[in-house]
């Protein structure tokens, strides 16, 4: 902006810019308060210096520490969900490769039977990762695929079963019921397994990602 000094007007415009960027009100408030504190402590007067501080503050607020998933250490079933086109199948493949590299025995369930070529895509990822895949026919029952995959995971003593699923919105009742059916099968057939559900989101979605979740 064209501000020459750091004053209330400067902070008000900065707040508006951050909120318009869909950072969220709570995070914006934390960024502004942290910035004000640093400006006061360091007795900063120049806007150009404040801009550098702002970048550091935003990075600190957005920082996510790398943590191990619980399912890396337990016999687990991981359900991958999300809307269409966000990269669920690719995420399944990459996660499988990462776990395989750590010495885990992984099985993939191709439970996205709706999207054309989804099974072929996941098969390619399973080949790259060097892991087994359980698949049915395109247009088949996803719950049946998960049932077969759960039994295969138990029989082969797999460490992690990762289930790819079709893209769905939370307001599509039939697809959400399909997801509930899959969950019921896992709970019934593999109650001893640790459960994890991962939602894959588009990074440009912004605050609407909370609605999807």
Language-model-derived ranges and their functions:
Residues 86-88, 168, 207:
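Gly/Ser/Thr-rich helix-start
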Residues 115, 167, 205:
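Short, glycine/acidic-enriched loop or turn micro-motifs at the edges of active sites
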């Amino acid at each position: 902006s064209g501000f020459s000094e750091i004053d209330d007007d400067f902070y008000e415009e900065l707040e508006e810019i951050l909120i318009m960027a869909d950072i969220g009100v709570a995070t914006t408030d934390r960024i502004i308060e942290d910035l004000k504190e640093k400006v006061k402590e360091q007795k900063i007067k120049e806007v150009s210096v404040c801009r550098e501080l702002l970048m550091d503050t935003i990075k600190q607020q957005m920082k996510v520490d790398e943590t191990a998933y619980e399912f890396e250490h337990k016999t687990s079933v991981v359900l991958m969900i999300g809307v269409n086109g966000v990269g669920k199948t690719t995420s399944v493949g990459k996660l499988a490769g990462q776990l395989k590299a750590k010495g885990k025995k992984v099985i993939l369930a191709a439970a996205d039977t709706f999207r054309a070529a989804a099974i072929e895509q996941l098969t390619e990822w399973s080949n790259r990762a060097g892991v087994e895949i359980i698949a049915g026919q395109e247009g088949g029952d996803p719950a049946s695929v998960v049932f077969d995959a759960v039994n295969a995971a138990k029989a082969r003593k797999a460490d992690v079963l990762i289930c790819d699923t079709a893209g769905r919105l939370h307001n599509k009742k039939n697809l959400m019921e399909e997801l509930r059916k899959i969950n019921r099968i896992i709970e019934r057939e593999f109650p001893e397994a640790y459960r994890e559900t991962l939602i894959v989101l588009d990074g440009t979605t912004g605050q609407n990602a909370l609605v999807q979740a």
